[in-house]
Amino acid sequence: IDGGNGGLREFFAHDWTPYEGEKGRIMEPGHQFEWAWLLVRWGSLRGNEEAIRKAKRLFEIGEAYGICPRRKVAVMSLYDDFSMRDGLARLWPQTEWLKAAVRLASVTDGEERQRYLASGLSAIGALQPFLDTPVKGLWFDKWPADRPMLDEPAPASTFYHIVCAIYEAEAVLAVHE
């Protein structure tokens, strides 16, 4: 996790410094959400408030900078200054957004909890266009920034993201009803 901006980069050199050049500046909102989810789970199990604090920052980055204002979906990548790098949206980051939001809601209360729950609802809304396909049970994987969903085969690797998001939402919300 970057000590300056609190975000997680995608590419590193062998000594864990950011990879040189443009590649070393890339941050994916989907991975900010995914690592927020991992850290809040680990932090809550271990009683590690620092991990939960870092999880909240990763989530904040994903939510504040990684959501396309027009389409309301998490995009593919940002630069380390949080400017847009690639506005393509894929299905899997929406699931990670949902997982992180509901897990963070589970370790917070009051207005903060309500904010994470509202964000989870936004993540569900972001999933909807990807699931609105002519063939029930399939999904669109990619939504370019400047055109409709790509009509291409649905990758099977996306299915576990969908199932895990459903499981996480159900598990967390069932305990906290």
Regions found by a protein language model. Name each.
Residues 1-177:
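Glycan-recognition and catalytic cores of secretory/periplasmic carbohydrate-active enzymes
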